[in-house]
Amino acid sequence: MAKSPTPIPAPPVKIQRDTNGVAPAAPATKPKKAAPKKRRKRRRNPLLWFLHGLIRRIYFGLKTASRLVLLVPILVFMVAFSYNVDRSGLFQGALAPRRIVNLMLQGYDVTNFEQMDERQVVQLFAQDVEQAPEAIGIGSSRVLQFNRENTGVDTFFNMGVTGADVRDNMTSYYKMVSYGKTPKVLLWSIDPWVFYGSEDAFDSRADADLYNEFLTKVLNVPTDYEEPDKVELWKALADPAYFQGNVDYYIKNRGQTTVTDDDGNTIEFNPVQGDPYDQTTTIKRSDGSVLYDVAFRTQTADQIRTLAAEACMSFNSVHMEGFDEMSTTQIQAFESFMDYAREQGTTVILVLSPWHPYLYGYLITEPELHKGFFQVENWLREYCAKNNVPLYGSYDPECIDGLEETDFFDGLHCAGTGIARFFPGIPQALQQLETGTLPDPLAVHPRTSLESADPDVVETLNGETAETAQEG
């Protein structure tokens, strides 16, 4: 076995010594840092925490509000502009009636009466007139000849409408009261169908919802009336699209003599040009009364009598078809309304506008067909005597001294000359009421049949009596 080679010796380890001959100590290991102690959270004061949050919210709220404040004038302008222009009539009423009322309030007479929505005009007048008139008139077309001249009141306004029924009468006055413009005097030309309880007594143009509102809120009569929800309606005021539409409409019609509606159609209601008494069409006066065209106002007695004769066959169709008896319900409504007006501080003056002599003479020949009609006047006379209510006129033309056929336009409508024969004017009526010198309502006895008239004297179409016609 061969011997291994001689191993190489390891080199000697050099030991460094310090100057004193001592070997240095082994290097010490670096001590570990002690783990930091976990700090204990300081508990917040709840009050301070709340105040801090509150201040923070207020700060950011004010910061946001300061930016929004810059938008407020713009929003206010949009709302005000849309409300006043209101091209769709959401708040101010339809454009055509608004134009009529605006012209009347400026003192203008207005053309094209036959095309007017009279009921809208009346309601918008109540809304827009700044101060309450001293006196207003209500009733059907039979009241429309009362004006500022024959009533003697400079601020009188006639709120009568064609075909007015009991609902039109009462709601016209109610609108004035609800707008805070209660008149001192209410002149009511009361028609017999006010006391008829049938649907035939109602006009389809009357505002039934407004009447139900009046019955429910004022007279406490149960109806199906419900307060309308106007939230969605008022949202339109802040609608940018509605604002833009109103701007377009305003720019289009500003300064124009011809005004259009929302659809671009011309609104044919304009100030009367020239003498109002020389117009070829019927016009609406600035006081609400009506001035018929010159041809209708200047008819001869024969022409007027012919129209009265034509009304004989259709008399009951004027809200009195089947009117055999006064309605207890309508009597109660009338009495409640009169009490309501007194509570508002309004003096009510009742007027019975006469019918043409030929027409009334015909009616008393068939009293069985007009029982309800003939009951009304005597009942009203008893009511006025009992309650000290001023009453002027009579349905029976023979009860009015000096009344002539030419004091009428036709069978139903008495002219201003006829009114002057029985109505002294509002100032004198109020004076008579104050001094206790009112005409005695029970001193007048209207004819209700031939038994209360001369049975041998009945007027015919040509103006003769039946007695003289037989002799001829």
Predicted regions and their residues:
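Substrate-gating cap/lid alpha-helix
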Residues: Y358-G393
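Active-site segments of SGNH/GDSL-like serine hydrolases
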Residues: M338-E366
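Hydrophobic membrane-insertion alpha-helices, especially the h-region
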Residues: K63-N84
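Alpha-helical transmembrane signal-anchor/signal-peptide segments
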Residues: N84-L103
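Membrane-embedded segments
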Residues: Q131-D224
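Histidine-centered active-site loop/cap adjacent to the catalytic His
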Residues: D407-P455
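Secreted/periplasmic serine-hydrolase-like ester/acetyl group-modifying domain
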Residues: S204-Q344, P439-G472
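N-terminal targeting leaders characterized by basic, low-complexity, disordered sequences
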Residues: M1-R42
